[in-house]
Regions:
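Glycan-recognition and catalytic cores of secretory/periplasmic carbohydrate-active enzymes
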Residues: 1-288
Length: 288
């Protein structure tokens, strides 16, 4: 396509990108990558980019999904769209197949899975609680949505709808989503087990609202749009008073600012809420 790059620079960039893509493809196993980060130069799988302890590829990590299998699947799908190389679509679909295989029948994903060698991946560690932070539900859902957009295959749509339906059901009555989800109780909770506790940290509201918006765009089902409006209503209700009129990162079951982790005391900022409300205004024209 048209570009403002010189021919030489375009060729060099293409060469650099394809080298990286081909290199990372070598580390895909049965559709998945072992980690969201690898220790250079030995390429030993590590937990995250800021907790680089090695785990020797014993599991597949879904939290911090932008850097793991769901995010890499989207990267290869983008590479296919830009470069037109069928290999990259194949790699993205293999990642998608792994994501679908790991999905719980109720539509959610857990933090980690044992290496997938055959049949369904098995959950590693706690299988009584999952979460909404750091793209744990959002990134695999968006991979499925973009694969459906690119291929039109129903299997991607079906898995994406399962995820979307889970998020609608897991939304708190007040419109928020919490940090965690109790699988046994089928309810959202914060770090301390309190229900109906909204949370902006680590992209929780942004991520789930994005999935709802995409689900509405793909299916046209009103319940996804209604979920978005409920989320915006909660954001407006959670706004704190003068003089700053900001928002906390974490809320308790009474919709009051609360602690998160030990270094996350009750506090206030504009980050994480204001842009969501402006986006909802752009979409709805509702000035409230």
């Amino acid at each position: 396509g048209e570009t403002y790059l010189t021919d030489d620079l375009a060729m060099r960039l293409n060469d650099a990108v394809t080298k990286h893509l081909d290199f990372m493809a070598l580390h895909q196993r049965n559709g998945a990558w072992s980690a969201p980060a690898y220790s250079w130069p030995a390429m030993i799988p590590c937990e995250t980019s800021y907790r680089p302890f090695a785990h020797a590829g014993r599991w597949v990590n879904f939290v911090h999904g932008a850097n793991g299998t769901p995010g890499l699947g989207q990267l290869y799908l983008l590479a296919y769209k830009v470069l037109g190389d069928q290999r990259y679509l194949d790699i993205a679909e293999q990642a998608g197949d792994w994501v679908v295989a790991a999905q719980d029948p109720e539509g959610y994903w857990f933090f980690r899975y044992d290496r997938h060698t055959a049949s369904r991946p098995t959950v590693k560690g706690d299988s009584t609680e999952t979460a909404f932070h750091d793209g744990l539900q959002h990134m695999p859902a968006m991979l499925l949505a973009t694969l459906y957009e690119a291929t039109g295959e129903e299997k991607w749509l079906q898995a994406f709808v399962r995820s979307s339906e889970f998020l609608v059901g897991a939304q708190n009555p007040n419109g928020s989503w919490s940090h965690n989800y109790d699988v046994a109780e089928k309810t959202s909770v914060n770090r301390f087990g309190e229900r109906q506790s909204g949370d902006f940290s680590n992209g929780i509201m942004h991520s789930q609202m994005t999935v709802m918006l995409v689900a509405y765009g793909i299916t046209g089902e009103k319940r996804y749009a209604e979920s978005l409006v409920r989320a915006a209503d909660w954001i407006a209700s959670a706004q704190l008073g003068p003089p700053t009129y900001g928002w906390a990162a974490h809320y308790n079951e009474d919709n009051k600012p609360s602690w998160g982790r030990v270094f996350e005391p009750p506090s206030m900022s504009q980050v994480g809420a204001q842009d969501l409300l402006m986006s909802m205004y752009d979409m709805t024209g509702d000035a409230r």
